[in-house]
């Protein structure tokens, strides 16, 4: 029975009632016009009666017959016709909005039926951008969008896969579930946008840009959740991008895009957990089987010798044959269903007739009989991934004792027979491999001569279609008869395979090929039994010499006389499978885009190859696969457990080694502390608020040096540049990230420096290790010292350039590997290198001639020789020595740790009271005791950043003791990055000493200046320690610190308080304006280049503004520090006058006021 073709033009199914509605003839011709299809012939009066167009469901518009012959609303057809006619090359099409007033007017005219043709539309508005905006407005105002609300979540989930073939196949399946009105309009819109994207050279609207514009318009969630819309935006744009790029495949059911990299495989995701998807799969399979119940018209000449010319003409004379796209005016190709002689080949390279008649005479006895039977069943049940269109009508096998004649005849059946067709994927190679037997035996595919040379070949698939089909006719009387009369043995096999068995076998093979799913059994109604299991395919990439030709791997259906052979072969194959099956699923290889030359198809070649090569002639052997999978999973779990155990053992060994090292180091420290018995500290009153660790011991005859902070995980230097001026024994402790303490005893004589480099190497070569190895190599080539303190300015500049180069190489390699520049978290591994870069840069600033000149000019008294703790002279030599030899000295050491305020009152009747308030905020991990020289180094010193000292040492640990003055022992020609001559000593003394000259009291004000990073504001923490004596009073007040590199500090101190405030407000305003300009430049740079300002070359256009901005920052910090100095000095004077009035009777007392003032500056 021949059925009429079902298209949108002759039937319509009402979604609400389910009834079929036949449209009127006027609706069919409504879109055509006498001028060539410009618009609809429906009168405006009729359109007005039909009602509005915008904001109306598409189903209602279609039922009202408000569509044209292309099954799209008239407003869409009018606008698309104008675009195709004259606006394909207009720049910014669909992106540039039109006039909103005109847009609303056009909407009103369409709703009132005043626009019936595209000429009417052009008369109302000829701006193509306004018309394009009207098209988007129509789609946007649909109550149910083109991608309906009910399928929104399914579309979003289908785009979550990383494999493009899975995304495209899933999208095609979901598009088939759209209502027919939505599907028709979406197809028309995708075709229009596809044509627009082909003119992207002129209109600048690529498929990606169009997807961004139309994605939110055609697809939106039912509840407008802003967060959900933002999260799903990339999926929405990606789905519509596939709609445009894969138009031919998605909207033409039997036509695939010519891009061979896209396959038709539709994989089931989460089938066990999602029964709906499983139902969709069977719905899709039913769509393939639906052609079995139809009877299309075939060629009139069924003979196997039909010529190609007759074939082409017969196909052209069959207008209703096969499947035709619903849009006849488009360029979609036809995909015909026919037998092998009716295949239309679009390739010009194939001009030969297909002849599948094979007559072979071989004297091979019973083995040929079995081989013939294998080949017959292979063609019935086994499907090769490279096969072209294959037609099988009848197979006859006759084996006689005298002459063995194997006649394989392929004949066309009559037109009234049913047909089952199935679509199969092929490989991505341009020329599929022909299916031919591997032995010189008889074959239905070609003619083999006596020498075993294959003379015949099947027709390969047309190059325009990367898909092949298998056509099997209804063979109710298919007989596979094999007669063997040799030796009195008569074996008659009459296998009658009906149509039902054939379809059942094809369904099983379809599942195994397309979906990696093997069905255990099917009922007569082709229903799936319950509790079916999914069997993943195997990866045979590691199996060697098991991929033979497609025809050599066969699946046989043997009779009862061959049961023993079947059992033996199955046992052997099981052993082979247990030894050769890989543990990696092919889904893993597909997800990671791993291709293999042995894989002839991307659907599931591994499973088919194993089944054909190992499971001999029996599909029931698939039942053994779950056991094999269980064994594989158990092996994987065992291997994982073994690996975890090995890792745990390695970690335990490492921890044990670290503990042993720590114990050894502690023992060494203990031994050294026992040897240093001559180290003593005379303290009559010890108020120790310092924690037990770290312990800091001070030696009277030891100069204190603070080297630069070594980079973490890198070479650490144990010597300071000041050590050549002292003959002593150095006991150094350096802490690296692996907690390895190396004690180096170095004997330093005059100018002998012993540098011990402790290299911390990691097991894996991370970028940091590679960078430091490169830097070490560059230093050796340039013959530079590894200690940056001993480098000259030129060497420091070279070191800075080398570090910068390594940092840029890290950024470049990161971008090459991950496709983007590293973020802040990604750069964390390179933090030690950044720290070293800042240290080198600070040394360059300190050692530059301009910086040295300014610092020397601002300092009043610099020691010409290094001053150690054993020196009895104070730093300020203009004053006489106030520390006479007294036999009774009370050293009040107040060690205040962790920012605690301690007030100690000690009533003493002696003449000389030395009150030393040591405020310790220690970030270091250890401090070593030694006889003569104590060198402090810690991994946390880089946080102090260029601390300065004028009369006392300021480092990670504040140190005080005795009547000995404390000073940095840096030589005059070498400047440390953390200890430099102070620029604010004179300004502070000028601000304080003019109120401290009362009677004969000698007040020595020692100010400790701590430098921190700028820009900063002031938050002063005062540490007060008052000592009330009957003969003397000493007060220690907290003062602020100033930055050594602040320019013109002494000039600022000459200004009045109001002038300083005005200057501060003015400079801050200038800095703010410059900051806005620089921020604007950064924003424009990011928009233009797609990245932030990162390199020096990027700042060239605003280099002057950038330098000015840095100067203003330094000036603001200096002004802030001066203002805080004045404020704190006012408090100091108030306290000093109060104490001075209480001590007028003590005119011959020597008061040493040691003011250790620490001010913590925080960032703005």
Curated annotation (Swiss-Prot):
Q: Locate the compositionally biased regions of type Polar residues.
A: 1-21, 444-456, 698-728, 979-995
Q: How does it sit in the membrane?
A: Single-pass membrane protein
- Point to the regions of Low complexity compositional bias: 22-32, 393-418, 545-579, 676-697, 729-766, 853-939, 964-976, 996-1009, 1024-1048, 1140-1158
Which controlled-vocabulary keywords does the entry list? Coiled coil, GTPase activation, Membrane, Transmembrane, Transmembrane helix
Which residues does the annotated region (Disordered) include?
Answer: 1-46, 302-329, 348-371, 391-468, 545-581, 666-768, 849-1050, 1130-1164
Localization annotation: Membrane
Annotated GO MF terms: GTPase activator activity
UniProt feature coiled coil, ranges: 627-685, 1057-1130
* Gene3D superfamilies (alphabetical): Rho GTPase activation protein
* Any one of the GO BP annotations: small GTPase-mediated signal transduction
Q: Where are the transmembrane segments?
A: 279-299
Q: What is its main location?
A: membrane
The record's listing under Pfam families reads: RhoGAP (PF00620)
Segments forming domain Rho-GAP: 56-251
Cellular compartments per GO CC: cytoplasm; membrane
Per the record, the domain of life is Eukaryota
Where along the sequence does the record put site: Arginine finger? 95
PANTHER family, alphabetized: FAM13, RHO-GAP DOMAIN-CONTAINING PROTEIN
Q: What does this protein do?
A: Rho GTPase-activating protein involved in the signal transduction pathway.
Q: What is this protein called?
A: Rho GTPase-activating protein gacU
Organism, scientific name: Dictyostelium discoideum
């Amino acid at each position: 029975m021949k059925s009429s073709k079902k298209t949108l033009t002759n039937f319509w199914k009402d979604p609400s009632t389910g009834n079929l509605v036949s449209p009127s003839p006027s609706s069919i011709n409504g879109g055509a016009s006498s001028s060539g299809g410009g618009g609809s012939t429906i009168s405006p009066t009729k359109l007005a009666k039909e009602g509005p167009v915008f904001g109306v469901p598409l189903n209602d518009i279609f039922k009202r017959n408000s569509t044209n012959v292309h099954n799209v609303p008239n407003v869409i057809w009018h606008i698309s016709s104008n675009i195709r006619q004259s606006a394909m090359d207009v720049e910014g099409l669909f992106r540039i909005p039109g006039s909103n007033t005109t847009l609303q007017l056009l909407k009103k005219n369409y709703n009132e039926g005043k626009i019936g043709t595209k000429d009417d539309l052009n008369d109302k508005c000829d701006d193509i951008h306004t018309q394009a905006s009207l098209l988007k407005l129509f789609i946007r105002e649909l109550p149910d969008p083109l991608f309906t609300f009910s399928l929104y979540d399914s579309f979003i989930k289908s785009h979550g896969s990383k494999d493009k073939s899975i995304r495209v196949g899933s999208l095609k399946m979901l598009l088939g579930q759209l209502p027919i009105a939505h599907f028709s309009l979406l197809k028309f819109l995708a075709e229009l946008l596809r044509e627009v994207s082909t003119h992207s050279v002129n209109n600048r609207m690529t498929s990606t840009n169009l997807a961004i514009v139309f994605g939110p318009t055609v697809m939106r969630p039912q509840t407008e959740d802003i967060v959900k819309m933002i999260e799903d935006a990339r999926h929405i744009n990606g789905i519509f991008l596939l709609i445009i790029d894969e138009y031919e495949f998605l909207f033409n059911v039997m036509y695939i895009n010519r891009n061979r990299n896209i396959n038709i495989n539709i994989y089931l995701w989460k089938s066990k957990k999602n029964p709906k998807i499983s139902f969709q799969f069977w719905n899709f399979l039913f769509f393939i089987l639906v052609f079995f119940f139809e009877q299309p018209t075939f060629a009139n000449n069924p003979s196997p010798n039909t010529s190609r010319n007759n074939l082409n003409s017969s196909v052209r004379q069959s207008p209703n044959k096969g499947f035709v796209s619903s849009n006849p005016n488009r360029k979609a190709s036809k995909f015909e269903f026919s037998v092998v002689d009716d295949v239309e080949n679009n390739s010009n390279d194939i001009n030969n007739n297909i002849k599948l008649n094979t007559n072979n005479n071989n004297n091979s006895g019973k083995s040929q009989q079995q081989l013939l039977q294998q080949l017959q069943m292979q063609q019935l049940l086994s499907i090769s991934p490279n096969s072209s269109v294959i037609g099988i009508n009848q197979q006859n096998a006759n084996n006689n004792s005298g002459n063995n004649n194997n006649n394989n005849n392929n004949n066309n059946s009559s037109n009234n027979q049913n047909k089952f067709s199935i679509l199969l994927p092929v490989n991505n190679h341009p020329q599929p491999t022909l299916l031919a037997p591997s032995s010189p035996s008889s074959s239905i595919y070609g003619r083999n001569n006596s020498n075993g040379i294959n003379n015949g070949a099947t027709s390969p698939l047309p190059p325009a279609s990367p898909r092949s089909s298998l056509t099997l006719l209804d063979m109710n009387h298919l007989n596979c008869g094999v007669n063997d009369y040799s030796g009195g043995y008569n074996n008659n096999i009459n296998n009658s395979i009906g149509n039902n068995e054939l379809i059942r076998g094809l369904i099983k093979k379809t599942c195994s090929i397309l979906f990696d799913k093997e069905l255990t059994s099917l009922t007569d109604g082709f229903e799936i039994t319950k509790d079916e299991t999914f069997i993943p395919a195997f990866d045979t990439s590691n199996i060697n010499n098991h991929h033979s030709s497609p025809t050599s791997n066969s699946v046989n259906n043997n009779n009862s006389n061959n049961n023993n052979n079947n059992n033996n072969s199955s046992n052997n194959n099981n052993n082979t499978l247990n030894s050769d099956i890989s543990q990696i699923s092919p889904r893993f290889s597909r997800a990671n885009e791993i291709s293999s030359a042995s894989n002839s198809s991307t659907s599931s070649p591994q499973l088919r190859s194993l089944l054909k090569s190992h499971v001999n002639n029996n599909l029931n052997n698939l039942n053994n696969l779950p056991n094999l999978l269980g064994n594989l999973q158990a092996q994987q779990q065992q291997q994982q457990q073994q690996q975890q155990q090995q890792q745990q053992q390695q970690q335990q060994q490492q921890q044990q080694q670290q503990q042993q090292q720590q114990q050894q180091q502690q023992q060494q420290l203990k031994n050294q502390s026992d040897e240093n018995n001559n180290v003593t500290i005379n303290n009559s009153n010890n108020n120790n608020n310092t924690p037990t660790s770290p312990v800091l011991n001070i030696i009277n005859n030891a100069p204190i040096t603070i080297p630069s902070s070594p980079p973490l995980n890198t070479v650490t230097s144990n010597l300071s540049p000041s050590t050549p001026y002292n003959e002593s024994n150095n006991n150094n402790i350096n802490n690296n990230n692996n907690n390895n303490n190396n004690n180096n005893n170095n004997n330093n004589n005059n100018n002998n420096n012993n540098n011990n480099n402790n290299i911390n190497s990691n097991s894996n070569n991370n970028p940091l290790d590679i960078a430091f190895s490169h830097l070490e190599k560059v230093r050796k080539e340039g013959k530079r010292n590894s200690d940056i303190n001993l480098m000259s300015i030129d060497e420091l500049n070279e070191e800075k350039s080398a570090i910068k180069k390594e940092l840029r190489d890290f950024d470049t390699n990161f971008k090459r590997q991950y496709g983007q520049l590293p973020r802040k978290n990604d750069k964390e591994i390179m933090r030690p290198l950044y720290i070293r870069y800042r240290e080198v840069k600070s040394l360059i600033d300190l050692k530059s001639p301009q910086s040295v000149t300014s610092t020397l000019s601002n300092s009043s008294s610099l020691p010409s020789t290094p001053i150690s703790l054993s020196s009895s002279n104070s730093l300020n030599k203009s004053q006489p020595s106030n520390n006479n030899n007294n036999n009774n000295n009370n050293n009040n050491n107040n060690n205040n740790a962790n920012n605690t305020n301690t007030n100690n009152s000690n009533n003493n009747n002696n003449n000389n009271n030395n009150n030393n308030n040591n405020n310790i905020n220690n970030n270091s991990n250890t401090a070593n005791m030694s006889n003569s020289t104590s060198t402090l180094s810690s991994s946390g010193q880089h946080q102090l950043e260029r601390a300065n000292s004028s009369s006392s040492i300021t480092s990670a640990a504040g140190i005080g003791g005795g009547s000995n003055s404390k000073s940095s022992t840096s030589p005059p020609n070498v400047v440390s990055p953390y200890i430099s001559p102070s620029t604010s000593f004179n300004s502070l003394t000028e601000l304080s000493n003019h109120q401290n000259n009362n009677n004969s009291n000698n007040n020595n004000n020692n100010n400790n200046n701590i430098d921190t990073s700028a820009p900063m504001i002031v938050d002063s923490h005062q540490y007060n320690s008052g000592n009330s004596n009957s003969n003397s009073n000493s007060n220690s007040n907290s003062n602020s610190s100033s930055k050594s590199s602040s320019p013109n500090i002494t000039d600022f101190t000459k200004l009045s308080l109001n002038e300083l405030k005005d200057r501060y407000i003015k400079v801050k305003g200038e800095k703010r304006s410059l900051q806005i300009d620089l921020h604007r430049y950064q924003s424009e740079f990011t928009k233009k280049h797609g990245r932030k300002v990162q390199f020096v070359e990027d700042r060239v256009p605003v280099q002057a503004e950038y330098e000015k901005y840095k100067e203003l920052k330094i000036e603001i910090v200096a002004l802030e520090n001066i203002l805080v100095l004045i404020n704190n000095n006012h408090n100091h004077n108030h306290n000093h006058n109060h104490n001075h009035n209480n001590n007028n009777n003590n005119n011959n007392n020597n008061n040493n006021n040691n003011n250790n003032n620490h001010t913590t500056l925080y960032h703005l």
